[in-house]
Amino acid sequence: MPGICGPNHYEATSSLHGTNDAPLFEGEAYGNPATCTVGSELAPGTYRVTLLFAEIYWGDGCPGGGGVGSRVFDVVLEGATVLSDFDILAASGGCLASTTSEAGAPIAKTFDVAVTDGAIDIQLPASVDNGKLSALEVRGPL
């Protein structure tokens, strides 16, 4: 099913550790807010949405430096906030693109979402820096 995320995109400049699925996490859509729209003619129903996150910019040994609290955002699916004040670095333990540390791991968060308008709308508004998303998976209708 087609989709688009943005408004901005970033690619890691060093190889990633902590995952066997590095291609899923080497890039990200980011912004304030970052947004994604998945599908345009989805049948009404409940869909299982898995959002994949990995910090590749902020943290020890990464391009942005900084640390916990450098990126904090909410996750809103179809108008409902499903995660508040999410800090990938705090949740994952480190930056996957770090050149000085092997700490950190990707994070997957799964939610069931009711779709009535033909598309799954995702917003990632930030209170610090930018919201971001590495990848996503949609299954359904369930």
Model-derived features: where do they sit?
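Compositionally biased, intrinsically disordered or flexible polar/acidic segments
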Residues: 1-142
